[in-house]
Amino acid sequence: FNGYLIMTVLATGIIYPIVGHWAWSSSYLSKYEAVDQLLAITGTVKTTGWLSDLGFVDFAGSTIVHSVGGWIALAAVIILGPRIGKYSDANRGKFTGSSFPLAVLGTLILWFGWFGFNGGSNGAMDETVPLILINTFLAAAFGLLTGLTISYLKFKKPDPFYIILGPLAGLVAITAGCNSMTSVTSIFVGIIGAIIAITVNEILNKFEIDDVVGAVPVHLAAGVWGTLAVGLFSDLTILDTGLDRFSQIKIQLIGIFAIGAFTFISSYILLSLYNKFFPLRVSPVQE
């Protein structure tokens, strides 16, 4: 628990502010009079981040919020290792959540809250908000249907984990471009996001990387896809970056790689150092 608290402080105090400045500073800092006053006094503070200057777009945070959390989670689970017996032949398939009904309820609450998350990121109640809300719903709904379909194809029955994974991946994926895509495109983004998340979850299990809550498939993988989808499918006139389609895709990839590399490397180093002095994992007896 102490390790979790330390990482939370490091993430919110160091990692998130840095990547947030890289990509969002031109959108937010310029609105505050205090920043203008600081500029007038010092003349040295740069209000725009380098990714923002390049034209990187992540409307509500598929990468800046979700993938960052996913990269931190990946570093943590690699350092911690799998739970005892998780991948033994005797226990395969037996490590499940304690209450799937509560997990599904939590998913529905998240889904509802996402309307405020994406809609509120617009900063104003204007004609853009209905499109944002519709796209958010469609991506989640078709992510759910995709998870359900894959579950039936694989297990011949609905699997709660896939049903939870699908809509959450759709929500994460559409977050970056919910204001600049058509409704049909948002459906496609949600479907592909769910497929990617489920695939990544299987890959993690194959390599015995124990991600208990599916943070890496949902937040990292679907977040990367959603950010790339902005370059692939968003209306360039709405993005208003002055870039053509190919250039926008290139800048999105640069942003994904830069933020991912910085977040994973810094969090892995910080967690490894902390783990040397204060073990992140409980003792085998406690576990």
Residue ranges of predicted features:
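Hydrophobic alpha-helical transmembrane bundles of multi-pass membrane proteins
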Residues: 1-287
